[in-house]
């Protein structure tokens, strides 16, 4: 008899096969960078980053790009950076469609230009003196603000998300992450990460 079963991660085998067949085993992801004008004088008006789907444009690789630009003689960018996301078609779904939890890293949507998996990594530490929770960040883009309203309370470390909520709002180019709820006061610290729904905050 035939029995229907959940494919789980086995579904990735089909997409991987299609990628190997279409792109070939030697395909390498890349990102192109264009300057608005010559950088012989050490300055340019702007840089354009054109993405081609590289999923591993990590912060370490971004620093490598910065060093390479400096080695080319670039010292200043007058009008900032522009990004080109046109290589991929616009997403027809939202990151929260799967389980209504859009900031979870596994819900990150495909993007032609994606830096550091669009993640923000941080550590939560209880502050018994103020009955609040301190947040320290590994890397936080300047256009992202955390509104920390957490308080100390009862709970268990592995299940701290049961009593803490992260919500994202965007106004112009600034994203605010509101953090509310009760953090387990018996936890010495918790390391956590979120993936922002907008993909341009590292540029």
Pin down the residues of each PLM region.
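Short active-site loop at a secondary-structure junction
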Residues: 2-18, 22, 26
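Conserved serine DD-peptidase/penicillin-binding transpeptidase domain
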Residues: 22-203
């Amino acid at each position: 008899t035939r029995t229907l079963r959940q494919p789980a991660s086995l579904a990735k085998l089909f997409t991987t096969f299609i990628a190997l067949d279409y792109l070939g085993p030697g395909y390498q992801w890349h990102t192109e960078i264009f300057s608005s004008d010559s950088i012989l004088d050490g300055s340019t008006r702007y840089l354009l980053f054109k993405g081609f789907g590289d999923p591993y444009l990590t912060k370490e690789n971004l620093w490598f790009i910065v060093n390479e630009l400096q080695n080319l003689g670039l010292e200043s960018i007058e009008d900032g950076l522009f990004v080109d996301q046109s290589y991929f078609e616009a997403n027809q779904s939202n990151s929260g469609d799967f389980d209504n939890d859009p900031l979870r890293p596994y819900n990150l949507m495909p993007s032609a230009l994606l830096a550091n998996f669009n993640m923000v990594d941080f550590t939560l530490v209880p502050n018994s003196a103020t009955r609040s929770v301190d947040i320290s960040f590994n890397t936080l883009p300047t256009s992202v603000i955390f509104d920390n309203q957490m308080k100390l309370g009862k709970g268990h470390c592995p299940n701290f998300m049961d009593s803490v909520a992260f919500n994202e709002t965007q106004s112009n180019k600034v994203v605010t992450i509101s953090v509310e709820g009760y953090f387990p006061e018996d936890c010495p610290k918790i390391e956590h990460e979120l993936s922002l729904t907008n993909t341009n905050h590292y540029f």
